[in-house]
Amino acid sequence: MHITQLNRECLLHLFSFLDKDSRKNLARTCPQLQDVFEDPALWPLLHFRSLTELKKDNFLLSPALRSLSICWHSSRVQVCSIEDWLKSALQRNICSRHESLVNDFLLQVCDRCPNLASVTLSGCGHVTDDCLARLLRCCPRLRALHLENCARVTNRTLTAVAAHGRALQTLHVDFCRNVSAAGLRRLRAACPRLTLRAEHSAAMIPDQLPRGPHAPGAALRKLLLR
């Protein structure tokens, strides 16, 4: 029996065992399999292990998406986490190649995936409060938001959770240095039923703008403490 003789349900089941690249390669072999690849039912979950994967065309964003994770574990994450005013020209150049990738991708998610229930972002040093606030507004069924080592996340994201995260049951903001203890207290008071975890976040040194002639020395001490 040829694979194209299988019914739609069997083909979807077969595709479900393949990774994104394998699904795309198989879909290229004939229009029938391409049609299966483009079936939203095949894509309830997406996991990305690097930012470059976000630029590929080997997946589908649709209202069927329920779970999304972007986990970037790379030495370049440390560069992204450095405050902009402390970065060298080389470091700024490195960041310029990918700094908008996650935000741009999440904006697409906001437009196409209103039924999203779970989001995990790890090592996404350029994701912004504004982007996360929009995600909360556009995905009203979001129940779990896990943020780890996202340097630009601040108390504004906590405020957005209180305002727009009506369905949110779990929030993790681990190793997010610009989230403060005061911001966490306000969120706990506003959302007492929310399961909130903030491992090390409030204890880390937050971003500071350079002040006065001694700023470079302070900046060096801060880098050494990280």
Curated annotation (Swiss-Prot):
It comes from the Eukaryota. The keyword Repeat applies. It comes from Bos taurus (Bovine). Keywords: Cytoplasm, Leucine-rich repeat, Repeat, Ubl conjugation pathway. One of its GO terms (cellular component) is Z disc. Its main location: cytoplasm. Pfam families: F-box-like. LRR repeats lie at residues 15-40, 43-72, 95-123, 124-149, 150-175, 176-201. Pathway: Protein modification; protein ubiquitination. One of its GO terms (biological process) is protein ubiquitination. Directly interacts with SKP1 and CUL1. Disulfide bonds: none annotated. Residues 1-46 form the F-box domain. Substrate-recognition component of the SCF (SKP1-CUL1-F-box protein)-type E3 ubiquitin ligase complex. Promotes ubiquitination of sarcomeric proteins alpha-actinin-2 (ACTN2) and filamin-C (FLNC). It is found in: Cytoplasm, Myofibril, Sarcomere, Z line. This is F-box and leucine-rich protein 22.
